[in-house]
């Protein structure tokens, strides 16, 4: 706690000569080395604490002003060292301001009674009419949010998690609004009940009310012109600009939301990009993207997702209200004009075309194209495995993680082939083989859940799924050899079904174990819950090996993994990988033949494919 002293009579005289006034000068306390010369037309009410004002502040590039306070009314305010506060149209009330801040041309900044700073709000994601399934707070990440959405119907679990989160909020919440060190707030109208962490810049915001902005020196936040943000939390590295309107939202690390995007009761995590469109009750996991004015994300759970223009979802059957929702698993895309009627579940890395009206559940056929032609629905299983788009996506996502090393709360596992997706592939391959067995080889098409699968598509689907299986098994075996955990797994953890918890790939058994520990009171804080997610991720390769080892035995009909078997797996891996690259090359050539792809772009892509042989060993 800093020591303050009262003003001397001489200091009061200097201040009054500079047109400053205080309701009670005895309640204006200053730092030991305080000098009163850089204060002009300042009015003080209540308890005031002032630091030293010795340095200059950069207000624009190559333009500095001396620190001080000019043309402002302050009530119950603490100001740190070397701040410049000027042109406050209304007042600053009940705030603590850090060091080296620049606050200029604002209207009002105040903390009112009962301020929550956006923390502890219960919002309803996916089910727009729900009772609430995500509690907003500063340490929320995509895993915890997905976990809450999935299990908040379990009252005991909900009560336990809510209690842990409320304890964390109670321990960390300030008594009044705070502005961190190095913050710049200019040309902004209203900032109410908002915590702003260090090195944040707010320029031209219209209203920030009941918010927490988690900026930091190495991963700062920018809030731009016309932004209205209420009851929300914004994480490190974010940019919220150009008249965004946001209410009851959480924005995770390094997200960009811009160009008039509107959002309500939604969460956005890690590197998501939202522009022009709208989100309501949407769960946008890592790398979710929507660029277009006519796109609406509503009642859906997404990750590694790209919304084409005029993408739309309907969560309303016009009967019991807007209560329906669905999941588009990781890597899914919706083409321009796509429409999905909820509830729906789309398998990982699939692409949706047209108006999908019959509530598909296609998690068992991943990497598919789902197409609607009028009333007729088609599915092309495995088609996306061999596309240029998939190849580019899986290469670009790791490079586009813009989060600073110090602010990576959400866990992102970039593996496109994992026990989660490969488990779906294994199931999908069996479904296609059984359809062929039941329908025979001499038919033109097959039916699956009201979707038509052309015979040629079924045959290719089996082929592509098998290619992916062999690539996956060979890649995991290669890593096991290099990292020294080859051999029979020492634990059964990892066997069985896997899930994707918004970026974290984990066995269902580990999720179930965490649920039981929370309900039984074996987890003492919400940070312990988060640490469990990190611990599961740290053991991913170990759990993956246990699952993949059993897959290899089952696929090749083995009792154990011998040297001869490993050689065969490796040879199959190389052949499958080359077949995969050859199919992607064909896809690229087909697009190039359309005539508007520049030769240089095509040649660069083909060169990357040519170098894929370098990764075989």
Short names for language-model regions:
Residues 1-9:
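Intrinsically disordered, low-structural-confidence terminal and linker regions
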Residues 3, 14-24, 30-53, 57-69, ...:
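Glycine-rich hexapeptide-repeat left-handed beta-helix
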């Amino acid at each position: 706690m800093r020591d303050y002293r009262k003003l001397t009579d001489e200091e009061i005289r200097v201040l009054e000569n500079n047109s400053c006034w205080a309701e009670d000068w005895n309640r204006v306390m200053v730092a030991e080395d305080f000098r009163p010369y850089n204060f002009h037309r300042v009015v003080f009410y209540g308890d005031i604490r002032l630091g030293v004002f010795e340095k200059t502040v950069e207000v624009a590039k190559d333009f500095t002003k001396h620190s001080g306070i000019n043309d402002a009314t302050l009530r119950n305010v603490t100001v740190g060292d070397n701040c410049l506060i000027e042109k406050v149209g209304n007042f600053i009330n009940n705030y603590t301001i850090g060091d080296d801040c620049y606050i200029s041309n604002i209207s009002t900044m105040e903390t009112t009674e009962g301020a929550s700073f956006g923390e502890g709000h219960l919002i309803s994601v996916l089910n727009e009419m729900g009772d609430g399934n995500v509690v907003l707070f500063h340490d929320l990440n995509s895993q915890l949010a997905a976990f809450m959405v999935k299990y908040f119907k379990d009252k005991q679990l909900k009560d336990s998690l809510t209690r842990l989160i409320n304890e964390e909020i109670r321990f960390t919440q300030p008594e009044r609004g705070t502005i961190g060190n190095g913050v710049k707030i200019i040309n902004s109208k209203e900032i109410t009940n908002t915590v702003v962490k260090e090195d944040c810049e707010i320029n031209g915001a219209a209203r920030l009310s009941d918010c927490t902005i988690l900026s930091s020196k190495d991963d700062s936040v920018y809030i731009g012109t016309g932004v209205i943000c209420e009851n929300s939390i914004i994480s490190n590295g974010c940019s919220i600009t150009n008249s965004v309107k946001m209410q009851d939202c959480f924005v995770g690390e390094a997200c960009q939301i811009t160009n008039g995007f509107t959002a309500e009761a939604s969460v956005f995590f890690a590197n998501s990009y939202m522009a022009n469109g709208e989100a309501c009750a949407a769960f946008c996991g890592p790398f979710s993207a929507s660029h277009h004015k006519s796109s609406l994300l509503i009642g859906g759970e997404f990750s590694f997702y790209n919304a084409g223009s005029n993408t739309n979802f309907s969560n309303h059957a016009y009967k019991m209200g807007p209560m329906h929702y669905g999941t588009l698993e990781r890597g899914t895309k919706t083409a321009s004009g796509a429409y999905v009627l909820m509830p729906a579940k789309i398998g990982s890395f699939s692409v949706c075309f047209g108006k999908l009206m019959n509530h598909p559940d296609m998690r068992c056929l991943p990497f598919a194209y789902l197409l609607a032609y009028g009333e007729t629905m088609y599915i092309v299983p495995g088609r996306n495995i061999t596309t240029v788009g998939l190849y580019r996506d899986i290469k670009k996502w790791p490079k586009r993680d813009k989060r600073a090393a110090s602010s990576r709360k959400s866990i992102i596992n970039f593996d496109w082939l994992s026990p989660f997706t490969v488990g779906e592939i294994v199931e999908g391959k069996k479904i296609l083989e059984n359809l062929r067995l039941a329908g025979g080889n001499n038919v033109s098409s097959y039916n699956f859940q009201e979707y038509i699968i052309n015979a040629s598509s079924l045959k290719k689907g089996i082929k592509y799924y098998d290619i992916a299986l062999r690539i996956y098994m060979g890649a995991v075996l290669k890593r096991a050899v290099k990292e020294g955990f080859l051999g029979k797994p020492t634990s059964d953890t990892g066997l069985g079904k896997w899930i994707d918890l918004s970026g974290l790939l984990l066995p269902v058994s580990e999720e179930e174990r965490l649920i039981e520990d929370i309900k039984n009171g074996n987890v003492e804080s919400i940070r312990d819950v988060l640490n469990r997610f990190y611990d599961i991720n740290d053991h991913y390769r170990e759990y993956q090996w246990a699952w993949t080892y059993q897959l290899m035995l089952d696929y090749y009909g083995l009792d154990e993994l011998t040297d001869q078997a490993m050689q065969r797996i490796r040879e199959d891996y190389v052949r499958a990988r080359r077949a995969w690259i050859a199919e992607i090359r064909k896809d690229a050539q087909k697009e190039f033949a359309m005539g508007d792809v520049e030769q240089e772009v095509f040649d660069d892509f083909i060169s990357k494919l040519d170098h894929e042989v370098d990764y075989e060993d």
